[in-house]
Swiss-Prot record:
Gene that produces this protein: Myg1
Biological source species: Mus musculus
Lineage: Eukaryota, Metazoa, Chordata, Craniata, Vertebrata
Protein family (similarity comment): Belongs to the MYG1 family.
Any one of the GO CC terms: mitochondrion
Domain of life of the source: Eukaryota
This protein's name: MYG1 exonuclease
Length: 380
């Protein structure tokens, strides 16, 4: 069992990764032709959303493509309902969770499923993302394949639980905006940090070859790449963003008389850390509550400022009745025409126009008792 275990772990994922280099990647910019349903030789399609991508759908797609039936699958990145309807399986988009039709979205207001709710007896109560849903429904089969054993093998049960608790749950929690800490106890494990990945390059206790030289070279390559990537980010993205945030703060009263709404000239820039630092330096009378900006598609976003830099709790979330709604349903409840969505946790929403995004922020401000002062505020 030991050799078969290691052979399954070390060879099958690598083979799948190498094969993936030669597969097509569908996109909104280059839309795929609709797959003829009667063409049994056509490769399967995995649908997910286009635009900014996140760890959960990347992991969901990667897990699926490790399975034989999806090994040659085409990834179709779109939000077009007709194109998604032509896909064999859809993850993280579509507003539907239906394993019978292979639809695995978690953004809809009605979705509250956890590993515990769908697998009675499991202890984990973190809301599932698309990664967790795919892992829940396909994980045992995938692990059995990678381990070179059957799904009935007790090893699969053990590894299934271990991989969820120490890998997938973290992805679920982060994507759903769930804080790791509550009452001093961690809700889920964080095991994919750079230090942890370097540590895992060391030989395991039961590997015949305990030489660390090759692993150390790989570790150097790993940390060098991440160091240079981070340096490049700070130099070319993070630092220039400070000037944009500083200018936005200076112009905030031209955006709204409350002074609580900031408009970024360029969307997508890393603004949060700069905002906290600048608030500390400038000591505005009230806290900045919302940031509005355009996304990659040219639509407008209204994002709530978190209470703290790494918190998932907002200073003022968008109204509860709006959360998890989209399009006309959201228009009706909010009274603001042209809405696109509000996230289920209320930390972000979308609108087709700048004025609409502003109105979403203003309507939220109007519903709270009083502005939120900063602890170090001084009168301006």
């Amino acid at each position: 069992m030991g050799r078969r275990f290691l052979r399954g772990i070390l060879t099958l994922p690598l083979r799948s990764v190498l094969q993936a280099q030669h597969r097509m990647l569908g996109s909104e910019q280059d839309p795929p032709a609709k797959r003829p349903r009667n063409n049994l030789m056509a490769p399967p399609r995995i649908g997910t959303h286009n635009g900014t991508f996140h760890c959960d759908e990347a992991l969901a797609c990667a897990l699926l493509r490790l399975l034989p039936e999806y090994a040659n699958a085409e990834i179709v990145r779109t939000r077009d309902p007709e194109k998604l309807a032509s896909c064999d399986i859809v993850v993280d988009v579509g507003g539907e969770y239906n394993p019978q039709s292979h639809r695995y979205d978690h953004h809809q207001r009605t979705f509250t499923e956890t590993m515990s709710s769908l697998c009675p007896g499991k202890p984990w109560q973190t809301k599932l993302s698309s990664a967790g849903l795919v892992y829940l429904h396909f994980g045992r089969k995938l692990l059995a394949q990678l381990l070179g054993t059957s799904e009935e093998d007790s090893v699969v049960d053990t590894i299934y639980d271990k991989m969820y608790e120490n890998f997938v749950e973290e992805v679920d929690a982060v994507d759903n905006g769930i804080s790791q800490w509550a009452e001093g106890e961690p809700r889920y494990a964080m095991t994919t940090t750079l230090s942890a990945r370097v540590a895992r390059l060391n030989p395991t206790w039961n590997q015949p070859n305990q030489d660390t030289e090759a692993g150390f070279r790989r570790a150097m390559d790993l940390v060098q790449e991440e160091f240079l990537q981070r340096l490049n980010f700070y130099q070319h993205s993070w630092l220039p963003a400070r000037a944009l945030v500083e200018e936005a703060l200076a112009q905030r009263f031209k955006v709204d008389s409350s002074g609580e709404i900031v408009e970024l000239a360029k969307g997508g820039c890393p603004w949060k850390e700069h905002l906290y630092h600048l608030e500390s330096e400038l000591s505005p009378k009230v806290a900045i509550t919302f940031v509005i900006y355009t996304d990659q598609a040219g639509q407008w976003r209204v994002q709530c400022v978190p209470k703290e830099p790494h918190s998932f709790q907002s200073r003022l979330p968008l109204p509860e009745p709006w959360r998890g709604l989209r399009d006309k349903a959201l228009d009706q409840v909010s009274g603001i025409p042209g809405c696109i969505f509000v996230h289920a946790s209320g930390f972000i929403g979308g609108h087709h126009t700048r004025e609409g995004a502003l109105n979403m922020a203003r309507a939220t401000l109007a519903q709270r008792p009083a502005p939120v002062p900063l602890a170090n505020a001084v009168v301006q």
